[in-house]
Amino acid sequence: MDQAKGKVCVTGASGFLASWLVKRLLLEGYEVIGTVRDPGNEKKLAHLWKLEGAKERLRLVKADLMEEGSFDNAIMGCQGVFHTASPVLKPTSNPEEEILRPAIEGTLNVLRSCRKNPSLKRVVLTSSSSTVRIRDDFDPKIPLDESIWTSVELCKRFQVWYALSKTLAEQAAWKFSEENGIDLVTVLPSFLVGPSLPPDLCSTASDVLGLLKGETEKFQWHGQMGYVHIDDVARTHIVVFEHEAAQGRYICSSNVISLEELVSFLSARYPSLPIPKRFEKLNRLHYDFDTSKIQSLGLKFKSLEEMFDDCIASLVEQGYLSTVLP
């Protein structure tokens, strides 16, 4: 990539990960065009305007994932596009129409706008490690790498709609990019933990808050899970954009641990919090991730301690938790 910092677009800029990515890009000296549903919503976007460099180098524009052409203006003239936006998942009786189609079409609509932009150098798509790990035929002793894809049939059978939507959307993105000569790189983060910039907690941050308050409902399904600091994921997006040799998929995950190990760690580190002690044992295959590909580009992952220390400090600052004593 050109060493001079240029203009880039971040879709869904007000989201949990996207906000942190915008923060990182501004600190790196990029001019950032962020797409949002409603640029006039001052309350929802105030956290973006507070970022260092925002007044000089951030512009927010309206775009709708389900409207073809609505990203044209935001993307035109940008050297890079970071597509982090994805449809909001809600309980549904029609996952095909309300989860799968929006995820695929939303991604393709962004790529259709990218195709029209002669300045484009690279698109970085936020996918998910769930596009790799949902299989029933892998060897638990061999870490999962980027060559592996989640089983579509397994997702449908067990109604794992989020993983299926991410898998189908990423596969559609690869097909479209190959057919249209778009330089695409995908980032596959595991479960994000860390400070939250938006005023309202996303489902991920809300799940962590629930666990720290003693709730078991959301985390009981985690079983074996990869965790990663939000800053590592944002930095990964920038690293794979800037490294000319970067190509293909990049798993982005620090620790893969069991739920029992997680709550044991949390209870020991934050004894003043009512961390649940017991969860129902899930019969799931052990797995680990091979992250040598992204580490070969120089990325070093933050520790589990840093993830949760930063997350808890943010939750305290925002008033979701009272002061946590070590």
Curated annotation (Swiss-Prot):
It holds the Pfam family Epimerase. Disulfide bonds: none annotated. One of its GO terms (biological process) is pollen exine formation. GO terms for molecular function: oxidoreductase activity. NADP(+) binds at residues 8-32, 44, 162. It is found in: Cytoplasm; Nucleus; Endoplasmic reticulum. One of its GO terms (cellular component) is endoplasmic reticulum. The keyword Cytoplasm applies. It is an enzyme of class 1 (oxidoreductase). Specifically expressed in anther tapetal cells during microspores development. Keywords: Cytoplasm, Endoplasmic reticulum, NADP, Nucleus, Oxidoreductase. Its EC number is 1.1.1.-. Disruption phenotype: Male sterility due to distorted pollen grains lacking reticulate exine pattern. Its main location: cytoplasm. Signal peptide: none annotated. Belongs to the NAD(P)-dependent epimerase/dehydratase family. Dihydroflavonol-4-reductase subfamily. Interacts with 4CLL1/ACOS5, PKSA and PKSB. Involved in the biosynthesis of hydroxylated tetraketide compounds that serve as sporopollenin precursors (the main constituents of exine). Is essential for pollen wall development. Acts on tetraketide alpha-pyrones and reduces the carbonyl function on the tetraketide alkyl chain to a secondary alcohol function. This is Tetraketide alpha-pyrone reductase 1. It comes from Arabidopsis thaliana.
